[in-house]
Amino acid sequence: MNIKGIDVSFDAQKKEILEGLKSSVPDASPKGHPDSPIFPLLDVINSHPDWVTTSSCSGRISVYVQGANSRKGGGYWLFVSHQAHEELPPVLEDEKVEYGKVPSSPVEGNREIQYAFEPMILHVQTRSLANAQHLQRVAASCGFRETGIQGSEQKFIVAIRTSLRMDIPIGCLTASEKLQFYITREYMCFLFKRSVEYFTENGNRMARLKEQLERQVEKRMKPRRKLRNMDDYLVQS
């Protein structure tokens, strides 16, 4: 039920979502549950009476094999982590891995491999459109300028996001299941070390966001002084 832009069922939905976070029930994240680096930020957001998180990712690096038909799924991760890594993981150091193999043209049956850094993304349901618009402004001021609002009269979702990312085709999985990388091993090492810088900046933006949202929670929870008479009003003015 919606009255003047306020979703009166929000409290019930928030209670259900928070109970799910405490249990083993999967959320809307690809992993099915939040990753630990983002827990402190989630705690702050969920302490606000007008917000609740619905899905999240603190940021990650990955080496991903596309599906046979990239539009229909079927891909998988060779490596994925929510932490910075300066050293190559064992899967990329295997003696069967071939580096510096650049095909002259696309080969049918090969599946592309992508290297990616993805920044923090967070979806927050809000009690009202006004709450969503305010949260959007706060997030944008902290470096999450691609933040947007999705929703209807029944539900408002703020997608907090930023453009701090890398997405690079680096190789292929052949029809015979061989890993062939277009780049050299040295360049692969460079990508992993470069991602450390991205993780650092991503963490800085998350810290700024957490600090600003803590202030918003404090303001929201602070009791308002009731004016008892006209003299109080004149003093306030």
From Swiss-Prot:
- What protein name applies here? tRNA wybutosine-synthesizing protein 3
So what EC number does this one have?
A: 2.1.1.282
This molecule's function is given as: S-adenosyl-L-methionine-dependent methyltransferase that acts as a component of the wybutosine biosynthesis pathway. Wybutosine is a hyper modified guanosine with a tricyclic base found at the 3'-position adjacent to the anticodon of eukaryotic phenylalanine tRNA.
Alphabetically sorted, this entry's keywords are: Methyltransferase, S-adenosyl-L-methionine, Transferase, tRNA processing
Q: GO cellular-component terms in the record?
A: cytosol; nucleus
Metabolic or biological pathway: tRNA modification; wybutosine-tRNA(Phe) biosynthesis
Q: Which source organism?
A: Schizosaccharomyces pombe (strain 972 / ATCC 24843)
Tell whether Transcription is among the UniProt keywords. no
Give me any GO biological process, just one.
tRNA methylation
